[in-house]
Amino acid sequence: MVSLGGIARKLFGSSNDRRVKSYQPNVVAINALEEQMRALSDEALAAKTVEFRQQLADGKTLDDILVPAFAVAREASRRVLGMRPFDVQLIGGMILHSNAIAEMKTGEGKTLVGTLPVYLNALAGKGVHVVTVNDYLAQRDSATMGRLYGFLGMRTGVIVHGLSDDERRDAYACDITYATNNELGFDYLRDNMKYDRGQMVQRGHNFAIVDEVDSILVDEARTPLIISGPLDDRSDLYITIDAFIPGLTKDDYEIDEKQRSANFSEDGTEKLETMLREAGLLKGESLYDVENVAIVHHINNALKAHKLFQRDKDYIVRNDEVVIIDEFTGRMMPGRRYSDGQHQALEAKERVQIQPENQTLAQITFQNYFRMYDKLAGMTGTASTEAEEFGNIYGLDVIEVPTNLPIQRIDEDDEVYRTHEEKFKAIIAEILEAHKRDQPVLVGTTSIEKSELLAELMRKQGFTNFQVLNARYHEQEAYIVAQAGVPGAVTIATNMAGRGTDIQLGGNLEMRVERDLHEVEPGPERDAAIARIAEEIQVLKQRSIAAGGLYVIASERHESRRIDNQLRGRSGRQGDPGRSKFYLSLQDDLMRIFGSDRMDGMLQKLGLKEGEAIVHPWINKALERAQKKVEARNFDIRKNVLKYDDVLNDQRKVIFEQRVELMDATDLTETVGDMRHDVIEDLVSKHIPERAYAEQWDADGLKTAVANFFDLDLPIHDWVKEEGIAEDDIRARLTEVAEKAAAEKAERFGPEIMTYVERSIVLQTLDNLWREHIVNLDHLRSVIGFRGYAQRDPLQEYKAEAFELFQALLNNLRQAVTAQLSRVELVQQPAEPQPPAMHGSHIDATTGQDEFAPLAMINETVVSPENRDPQNPTTWGRIGRNEACPCGSGKKYKHCHGAFENNEVV
């Protein structure tokens, strides 16, 4: 039965259809200019950039020049890249320019679509940021698309981990900058910890196009980016606490997998109190006494490490380190660390070296970072399921771009088995069947553990002709994924295979050329070899198509429908045939957590025998409902995080704006003078209250305070004994003496040095107090939820108390700066203030725990070629992957010594 809404959509078209149609006149206009642009010489086409910039300077808007600018970018793309954007890609580009999200299916050329609005918006000269999910994609896309922008007279920069501040500053100064979301966020935080405006690297937030926008703005949104510094080493305590956990039984604790929480029962608490008392770690009688808060925290982390975190699913142990696995992508995140002691608890569990804990120095969520941009847009293949969130939080519409060719992929109903064993048996049988008919197969798993289990089961069946792609072997990721479309190929992959690299039927020409011809110099011989490879790929493609195209088999449903859709979307690109199917069991995490007991009983009543599956659209709908529940819960979490983070964000903006003003100021005399005046006001009000009798004045307290804050020994006792003296008189005398002392110091130092000293002291003091403030807000937030039991709104309570804490911060700043400036003396060479040792982190999106990564301010130095010893790699410094290897082999670094970086022997 067709719904009324369905009838209306057929008659009038959906809102999405109407929005797409609204761009059609511009498409027609761009196409009308095609012949004219094609007739231009390379020089004349490139000169259009200067012409457009002049038009903008004369008062035209970007919208006014959209049609000719898109026509120029399209023609330049055809000449430089050999790719001409289709009409639907022009529409995608216009969607991005209009501050919206373009939902485009896999293989529809999102990277090429981005070049059109990037070129148009870069003409304004304010910079455009193209945001990717990893360094590999940032480098790949900037290198490829940089040729196009360079042809049109624009500079392209790329920000990746390991660049110096000078390199970052230069990259941000380019017309177009490619970077990962993490690098952008960390650079923003680090910039706001600098002590000189000239040291800052970013130049503003004009326009950002976020690739894989759902991954960055949704999956990562509930977890802040954090810059932190090391605390004292407490590794012995972690090891001692860890030893208690194996002595507990199941009755001693409760695990909630839905909420990812672990708590001790009453019996468990008593048992732990006995253990801690014997170890001399318990203070007082009860574990939950105030003085035992830190111990409770350690014990909870140890319990989570053993009962919630699974090795080879949540993390792996590699090179004697605990390395986090991203649950959304399956990728390893080397250097990232959980915060709050959780990573140390895992290190104690795995008996590897325990690294020191960290203290938060600065933090921001991606939600608040990306909302700073004047214009924001995004691209992805899967955004419609989160359209409400994009609209509510970022003000972004999601517009589905039609595919250039109809999708031919067949999405089959799920098959549900009772146990893992039955499910994997069915999957292997299906893989072998597809392999017999030469059909390429991509098998998606949710964890490393599952991918390796499936691989082992296949080996036991005697089948070894497959590739395994998971976080253990991520170095080979791009090539394995690129070749997954070859006839008969079987690729077992975690979620990481879902993004970044296209699976092309028959294989990927670019990857084949790089692998097979990297030692062949450019020339006729190389050109002929490329032509041979291209011909071979075409033959293989036809074989893959004849076998039914790429067959995506999923071994489990993810809690997010988007991740499932991404996996499905690997098949059926650009009108190719394809097929997808999910194999599930009642023991899968999603089924088990969301009420599979009922379903198991029902299947038994239906008489389902071992090895048999149930296939029914009702199952798909039930699973979709479960996934929607999880997505709704996660959306609520993200909305809640944002409400609280907005409080911190407002305060962060004030502090960061103040820092910039302080760095820009040429004279801080008035600023520190106001602080000094406020301190005097506070001291007099506190020790000589208004309308109090002279006998009630606290002369001793005032004298001590003046000595502490102004380094002055004043006859305050004599002043208060004078006949008829009032608090205003004392205030005036204090002000006069303090101003005179400050003026004498300023004259002694000289204006230039005095301003430098004032700026250094104010900035360093502000930074130290801001760090303490972040910790205080974290503590406040961790307990504010209990106010709900008293029928008070925790958010409103948090806002009120956060404001009081902020007022206290400003008051402490005035006092600390005044006291330090009163005592500061001139030394021969004033030391440049140095930022603290820093680490970066981004909390894992699925567990709500931090992931800490050491991010040095400057990680590696660049060494000039003449200072490199070919025999000693330690003298080489940082080397670009495409540079010649310093060893003298003649090969590119990535194909010589660079090939050994980060690899492990498997």
UniProtKB/Swiss-Prot annotation:
UniProt similarity note: Belongs to the SecA family.
By its UniProt entry, which Pfam families does this protein fall under?
P-loop_SecA, SEC-C, SecA_DEAD, SecA_PP_bind, SecA_SW
Q: Which CDD domains match?
A: DEXDc_SecA (cd17928), SF2_C_secA (cd18803)
Q: Does the keyword Cell membrane apply?
A: yes
Domain of life where this protein originates: Bacteria
The protein's matches in PROSITE patterns, at most eight in alphabetical order, are given as: SECA (PS01312), SECA_MOTOR_DEAD (PS51196)
InterPro entries associated with the record: Helicase_ATP-bd, P-loop_NTPase, Rhodanese-like_dom, SEC_C_motif, SecA, SecA_CS, SecA_DEAD, SecA_motor_DEAD
For Zn(2+), which residues are the binding ones? 885, 887, 896-897
Annotated residues that bind ATP are located at 89, 107-111, 502
According to its UniProt record, this protein's enzyme class is translocase
Q: Which GO terms describe its cellular component?
A: cell envelope Sec protein transport complex; cytosol; plasma membrane
Name of the featured protein: Protein translocase subunit SecA
How the cofactor binds, per note? May bind 1 zinc ion per subunit.
Q: Which reaction does it catalyse?
A: ATP + H2O + cellular proteinSide 1 = ADP + phosphate + cellular proteinSide 2
One of the GO biological process terms: protein transport by the Sec complex
Q: Is Nuclease found in the keyword set?
A: no
Q: Which GO molecular function annotations are given, in alphabetical order?
A: ATP binding; metal ion binding; protein-exporting ATPase activity
Which keywords are on file for this protein?
A: ATP-binding, Cell inner membrane, Cell membrane, Cytoplasm, Membrane, Metal-binding, Nucleotide-binding, Protein transport, Translocase, Translocation, Transport, Zinc
Which proteins does it associate with, and in what oligomeric form?
Answer: Monomer and homodimer. Part of the essential Sec protein translocation apparatus which comprises SecA, SecYEG and auxiliary proteins SecDF-YajC and YidC.
- Give the way it sits in the membrane: Peripheral membrane protein
Record's HAMAP family? SecA (MF_01382)
- What does UniProt give as the signal peptide span? none
